[in-house]
Amino acid sequence: MSEVTFPEGFLWGGALAANQSEGSYLAGGKGLTTVDMIPHGEHRMPVKLGLEPRFTLRDDEYYPSHDAIDFYRRYKDDIALMAEMGFTVFRTSIAWSRIYPKGDELTPNPEGIAFYRSLFEECQKYGITPLVTLCHFDVPMHLVTEYGSWRNRKMIEFFARYARTCFDAFNGLVKYWLTFNEINILLHSPFSGAGLVFGSEDNREQVKYQAAHHELVASALVTKIAHEIDPENQVGCMLAGGNFYPWSCNPEDVWAAMEKDRENLFFIDVQARGAYPSYAARVFREKGIEIEWQDGDAELLRHTVDFVSFSYYASRCASADMNEKNSSAANVVKSLTNPHIPRSAWGWGIDPLGLRITMNMMYDRYQKPLFLVENGLGARDEIDANGEIHDDYRISYLKQHIQAMGEAIADGIPVMGYTTWGCIDLVAASTGEMSKRYGFVYVDRDDHGNGSLARTRKKSFWWYKKVIASNGCDLSE
């Protein structure tokens, strides 16, 4: 492996999401969102998948997002911790329902705007550049119950109004924007991804892809708006990344892997290239999907993103017969268990070379700068008798992936920056657990909402501080 060299001005930092960190789920005039309806425990996955509709909260269930890690009230202290590590970028999201509590109002909630302005000003104080996602798995529930969420074309108007409000309110404080977090998760986890709930008569593929069309048009429209408001604004898309390997060199397995890659890359094909890919027509025909277009949609889609951002935790594996092989249920994106790579405690593959492969595949395809905005290892952390957390396993994972990212840069790929996921421990989106920890900072909170919420620096905190100070040159453990 060659010596890792990162460009001058490379952005180093970490990422959180409003719905997994803020808590205070009704404070400051905020409205309910989809994630506020997703409980911890056995019902979590059926609700996330849209198979078990939830329109009201239940007294007998625990909802992790309601309190999360209390970032809403502790953000100044948390940003100070990020500054101590030397962050130059902090990725977070704006909760749509803090700005428009129902989602369809004509005027925004001033308390929500004031909160985020204060948050971004705090970042500015420390020289930390915000990277802001407009919708991170938290559609206002009113838009779900009254409009059917993204199956309804009216959502384009509501999202555009919300985005314009944010671009105006935070102009000069935020210039890097993402429209939808992991937009392809709509296909795999429809309720959490896009607020979709299915009826017994629905053609689910039709509903999902029509909703996807509305999101893609909305994304292009707000990209256009962002550039009109301030030409300095840069807007990116965001993919739940990870390439598919074929199970074998059997051509049928190779084709199956390519189809699975296309299923996920379809969204970025539209957002980065400005039109539906040619292969989509056959996919739609074979699935009985008929997308309803309106005049002007094709023209809007030509407003492509400035950069391509993505998450990468693990590669994936596909076969022509996914049911006969050893399938992994580690994440909502179905994959076979690759016998050639180690796995985390939650069954996620650990494959740093897969990151380099994914980055090369995406840059070959899009020829736009890349931004790795989620990467990390979910693991159980133990506090020793001295109150310390020695998370060498996390350091090892991140070191290997930073090296792989450096190799991708050496391959000629322009990479804007790197934000590790859950830089401060947060509620895991997939499981709702706190015990699945990603952070450099430990949060005293358990899976049932108990704990002081006190913050403790882990060993990885000091390691990442050294990495940033050396611009990625010193990865020694």
Where are these regions (language model features)?
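Active-site mouth loops of central-metabolism enzymes
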Residues: D60-R74, R151-R153
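Active-site region of glycoside hydrolase catalytic domains
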Residues: S2-D59, A83, K102-D104, I113-E477
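A short acidic, glycine/proline-enriched capping/turn motif at secondary-structure boundaries
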Residues: T88, S97-I99, F137-V139
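Catalytic domains of carbohydrate-active enzymes, especially glycoside hydrolases
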Residues: R74-A95, H303-F307
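Glycine-rich, proline-tolerant flexible connector loops at the mouths of alpha/beta enzymes
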Residues: I94-P108
